[in-house]
Amino acid sequence: MEKKLMRIGVSLPGELLDKFDKTLMKRGYSSRSEGIRDAIRTYNQHYEWMQQIKGARAATISLVYDCSKKGITSTLAKIQHEYIDLITSSVHFHIEEDFCFETIILEGEGEKIVELAEKILSLKGVKHSRLTTMPEVKTE
């Protein structure tokens, strides 16, 4: 079966595109299109992995966000209060004048952890984010 390629248009900030192009060159990609296809495959694999997180888990959500963006700090606090039963701790510090780094430590049901992560990771103003999980360790 022949795979048909689709042409799409994407708008990106110039700085992000420049960094992407430099990364592609360093990694030896033959074209920007191949790099974008690889990035989309990785994104889709990560999403599929997140959908398989089930059962008791320990996890962290780490994020960098633009704290000067109107409403993001209060929105993050509101979301965290909605999931207070999962959150065991959080660490927050300022890495630049307008950017904060936060790590939220979680313990609970995998499906609820993913639900919380998706709410946070999709916020406008979140520049980098990562969900990391591991099976909950039980001592008997």
Curated annotation (Swiss-Prot):
InterPro entries assigned: Acetolactate_synth/TF_NikR_C (IPR027271), ACT-like_dom_sf (IPR045865), Arc_rbn_hlx_hlx (IPR013321), CopG (IPR002145), CopG/NikR_regulator (IPR050192), Ni_resp_reg_NikR (IPR022988), Ribbon_hlx_hlx (IPR010985), TF_NikR_Ni-bd_C (IPR014864)
UniProt superkingdom: Archaea
Keyword Metal-binding attached: yes
Residues annotated to bind Ni(2+): 81, 92, 94, 100
Cofactor(s) recorded in Swiss-Prot or TrEMBL: Ni(2+)
Alphabetical list of Pfam families matching this protein: NikR_C, RHH_1
Similarity field: Belongs to the transcriptional regulatory CopG/NikR family.
NCBIfam families: PRK01002.1, PRK02967.1, PRK04460.1
Name by which UniProt lists this protein: Putative nickel-responsive regulator 2
Lineage per the UniProt record: Archaea, Methanobacteriati, Methanobacteriota, Stenosarchaea group, Methanomicrobia
